[in-house]
Amino acid sequence: TRIITDPIRFGKKSKISALFDELEPEMAKLDLRRDGDGDEPIVLTKILRLRQEIELLKVPDLADMVEEAREAGNAVAVFLNFTDSIDALSRRLKENHSFVQGGQSKDARDNAVSDFQSGKVGIVLCNIAAGGVGVSLHDTTGNAPRVALISPTYNAKDFHQTLGRVDRIGGKSETIQRILVAEESIETKIVKSMMTK
């Protein structure tokens, strides 16, 4: 398995950078407010909203990455944090794909995974909260090397669980996992910290 964390210059870099400029002080506030002064929910809500906007701005480039990986003969698993991003990416993709996301029945989830594993679809879009645990998306035949495109989550446990979805014992081909880190952003530091945990 190769895990690539090199920062990416996204097409909407200036908008993404502006949002990170808003995000960074909010994260610092959260660290300072661990004393329980009651403002944590407000700060957390703002951080969540900013992260959602940032992830959505990455979608056009992400769609291109998915298409490039498919053209190279890879099966692609995309892990995102927000439903809006999954929906936006789904609208941009020309190829059929399956979904693993919250609110699905066990049967629907199992069918989505089965369609991906069997090669019926070459792309699966996963919500990290729903597809990060208990889902095996590794290459079991050797016919479709896996590429995972992973939006950074700020939770180390979720991050490591997500890395384990396409890289499993018994995998028949090399896996490439690309963490979608925006260049010159706090994401670089966050992902570096999680990689060492």
What are these regions (language model features)?
Residues 1-75, 80-84, 88-92, 197:
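Interdomain linker/hinge connecting the two RecA-like lobes of the SF2 helicase core
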Residues 6-8, 100-102, 180:
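Hydrophobic residues at beta-strand termini and immediately following loops
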Residues 75-79, 87-88, 94-133:
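Conserved helicase ATPase core of P-loop NTP-dependent helicases/translocases
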Residues 95-96, 121, 140-147, 171-177:
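Short glycine-/polar-rich loops that comprise or flank the Walker A/P-loop
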Residues 129-169:
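Conserved RecA-like helicase motor core of SF1/SF2 enzymes
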Residues 154-197:
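A conserved SF2-helicase RecA2
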